[in-house]
């Protein structure tokens, strides 16, 4: 332990035992409190005295009482130590202190202090570095592009890795990236990519066609079991035609393959090493349980990122810290433009049709549909940043608000099932908002005699299918990436999607057939019709119950430039920059 941590333990012992700022205690008792030898206790007390934290008056003789006088009351002392931890960038110790049994008023001040630590910081001055520190209240799941499925992790992976092409959703076109050009044969079944020369991975290795082939083969590997493996099904062969030329041979013509090679799942990884090594604008320099550190890639094949360093820190779930890109607040800072974002995709409930249970009964699913009155839930839980959803697309939810729902309708549908009081298991992520939704639904279900058992599980178990295999239904969310059509298809094809996992039997086959037609369709209007048909079918069959979209509004200071948020709610780290104050 560090000296600061010993001092904190001493102050916590003082608080727990209601000692005054002058505390009488033996060296042996102190050794027990701080879990060290009597000799080390004396060394620690001398060092704390030198730091002017306390005065130590040792007792005469072995076993006699010593007197400790703290120079500050416990609130002031804890806050001072907390500031020192942050000044020394010992965020681990600061976060551990937040987890201690402190009074609410002290914790409130610590959270406020921590808030100022995140956001943009400039290190220097001689070697000025732009550093962005971002808090997250949960552990990160995988950043491996072949497996990444969570929106924030997908965004971080985009900063580490690159794809052959990039898709421009607004212009509906594919732009060159790692491949500077590509050809599609007359029959549409052979696609040739021409790779840029001189592109380097973060480990210094030059990218070649062998790395692209390896990336594809790894995604296709049955043993690897990537949730995006379905994207490889239409490819019959891959051939390296030279170090910077590669060909993909398709089983049939489909433009969707260009979408696949633009997706994060096919981001290129080096043939000989896959541990977070990419070609992206940022490289991983540190990755522990509590922090991910990204440094600007100075050898990036395109324009270097303006930010020099990004740190993503895990903080306690109850932390009142919500900054992502904002600068520390300043009284003199002019307000910049607000960026509005309404989540594309939505939270939803779906049912496990792999399990032999009452969820196969339409009337039961309708009972849950009637119970899950989102407009009422938003009102009762005061969740004003939510929009009740009737579609995965917010513009459609606005045009078609939810129909009126009543407990009487829910009770009538439940009665039609012949329900006998059995317990139904509802799974959801062990997160604040998911818990609130699940508890609200459980309470409402009780009013019509429906027994629901809540099963929260951590995000780290997202890919473990056994964790939710015996669930009857799940409360989940889907946030779409900028490539909307691909994101929609992924919702049904991606193995980590609970709609893909749970939608089984004839219902699943029917939906997958229409998804297949959507994949082969190139006309934009016809694509919309297929997506409308799928959503309508899911609604009528009560297979996916849309709940709400999340509305986000971010206000950025005027000095934060080039901010444009993607559908995940993140700004592209490689583009944002801080305009320095000029005196």
Label every PLM stretch briefly:
Residues 19-28, 34-39, 43, 52-58, ...:
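Ligand/substrate-recognition segments at binding pockets and active sites
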Residues 20-23, 33, 42-44, 149, ...:
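Aromatic- and charge-enriched surface segment that lines or borders ligand/interaction sites
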Residues 67, 228-271, 286:
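Surface-exposed binding/hinge segments that line
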Residues 103, 492-557:
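Extracytoplasmic/peripheral linker and loop segments enriched in polar/acidic and small residues
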Residues 135-184, 569:
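N-terminal lobe/hinge region of extracytoplasmic solute-binding protein
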Residues 299-339, 343:
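Ligand-site clamp/hinge motif
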Residues 361-443:
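Append "and occasionally in soluble cytosolic enzymes with long acidic Gly/Pro-rich linkers
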Residues 556-583:
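Long beta-strand-rich cores associated with HINT superfamily self-processing modules
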């Amino acid at each position: 332990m560090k000296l600061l941590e010993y001092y904190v333990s001493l102050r916590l012992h003082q608080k727990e035992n209601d000692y005054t700022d002058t505390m009488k205690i033996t060296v042996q008792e102190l050794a027990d409190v701080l879990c060290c030898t009597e000799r080390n206790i004396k060394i620690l007390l001398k060092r704390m005295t030198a730091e002017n934290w306390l005065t130590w008056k040792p007792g005469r003789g072995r076993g006699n009482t010593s007197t400790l006088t703290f120079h500050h009351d416990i609130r002031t002392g804890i806050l001072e130590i907390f500031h020192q931890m942050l000044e020394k960038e010992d965020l681990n110790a600061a976060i551990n202190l937040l987890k201690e049994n402190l009074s609410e008023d002290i914790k409130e001040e610590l959270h406020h202090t921590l808030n100022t630590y995140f956001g943009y910081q400039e290190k220097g001055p001689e070697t000025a570095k732009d550093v962005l520190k971002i808090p997250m209240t949960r552990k990160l799941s995988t950043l491996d592009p072949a497996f990444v499925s969570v929106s924030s992790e997908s965004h971080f992976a985009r900063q580490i890795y690159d794809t052959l092409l990039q898709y421009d959703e607004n212009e509906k076109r594919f732009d060159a990236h790692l491949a500077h050009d590509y050809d599609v044969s007359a029959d549409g079944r052979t696609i040739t990519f021409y790779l840029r020369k001189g592109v380097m991975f973060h480990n210094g290795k030059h990218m070649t066609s062998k790395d692209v082939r390896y990336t594809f083969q790894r995604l296709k590997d049955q043993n690897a079991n990537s949730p995006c493996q379905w994207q490889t099904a239409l490819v019959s062969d891959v051939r390296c035609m030279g170090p910077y030329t590669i060909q993909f041979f398709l089983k049939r013509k489909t433009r969707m393959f260009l979408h696949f090679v633009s997706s994060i799942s096919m981001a290129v990884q080096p043939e000989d090493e896959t541990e977070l090594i990419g070609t992206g604008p940022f490289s991983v320099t540190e990755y522990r349980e509590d922090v991910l550190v990204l440094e600007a890639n100075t050898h990036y094949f395109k324009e270097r990122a303006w930010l020099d360093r990004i740190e993503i820190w895990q903080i306690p779930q109850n932390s009142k810290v919500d900054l992502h890109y904002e600068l520390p607040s300043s009284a003199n800072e002019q307000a910049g433009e607000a960026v509005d974002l309404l989540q594309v995709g939505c939270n939803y409930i779906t049912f496990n049709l792999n399990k032999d249970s009452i969820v196969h009964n339409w009337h039961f699913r309708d009972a849950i549909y009637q119970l899950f009155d989102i407009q009422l839930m938003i009102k009762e839980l005061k969740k004003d940043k939510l929009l009740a959803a009737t579609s995965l697309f917010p513009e459609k939810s606005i045009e078609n608000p939810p129909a009126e729902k009543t407990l009487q309708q829910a009770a009538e549908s439940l009665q039609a099932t012949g329900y006998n009081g059995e317990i139904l298991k509802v799974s959801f992520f062990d997160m604040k908002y998911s818990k609130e939704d699940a508890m609200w639904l459980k309470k409402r279900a009780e009013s019509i005699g429906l027994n629901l058992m809540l099963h929260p599980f951590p995000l780290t178990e997202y890919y473990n299918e056994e964790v939710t295999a015996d669930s009857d239904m799940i409360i989940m969310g889907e946030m779409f990436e900028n490539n909307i059509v691909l994101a929609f298809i992924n919702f049904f094809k991606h193995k980590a999607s609970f709609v893909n996992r749970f939608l089984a039997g004839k219902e699943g086959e029917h939906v997958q057939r229409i998804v297949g037609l959507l994949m082969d369709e190139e006309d934009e209007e016809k694509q919309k019709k297929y997506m409308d048909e799928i959503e309508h079918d899911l609604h009528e069959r009560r297979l996916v119950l849309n709940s709400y979209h999340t509305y986000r509004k971010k206000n950025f200071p005027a000095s934060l430039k080039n901010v444009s948020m993607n559908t995940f709610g993140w700004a592209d780290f490689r583009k944002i920059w801080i305009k320095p104050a000029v005196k």
